[in-house]
Amino acid sequence: MAKMFDLRTKIMIGIGSSLLVAAMVLLSVVFCLYFKVAKALKAAKDPDAVAVKNHNPDKVCWATNSQAKATTMESCPSLQCCEGCRMHASSDSLPPCCCDINEGL
């Protein structure tokens, strides 16, 4: 019975297939990051922020679209607020401020 592939051919097929798998994984990671950044930029263009009247103009209360229509002065303290546009790196749980679309990217 004759050998179908010698050792060099098997090694070359293994290297080629591993490079193909690595390229596909890298491509999927790039697409995933692209869609995340596109979603973040789209959300930054249409911020769901409602400024509170009679308060500090630097404070912005964040709400969803349905809450933004019915937000009153009494319901605002339950929403998350941020002071100004400069936030520390330790405050990941707060929403991004709406100063610049590309800020934080």
Swiss-Prot record:
The keyword Iron does not apply. InterPro entries: FAM24 (IPR028122). GO terms for cellular component: extracellular region. Pfam families: FAM24. Residues 1-32 form the signal peptide. It is found in: Secreted. Coiled coil: none annotated. PANTHER family: PROTEIN FAM24A, PROTEIN FAM24B. This is Protein FAM24A. The lineage of its organism: Eukaryota, Metazoa, Chordata, Craniata, Vertebrata.
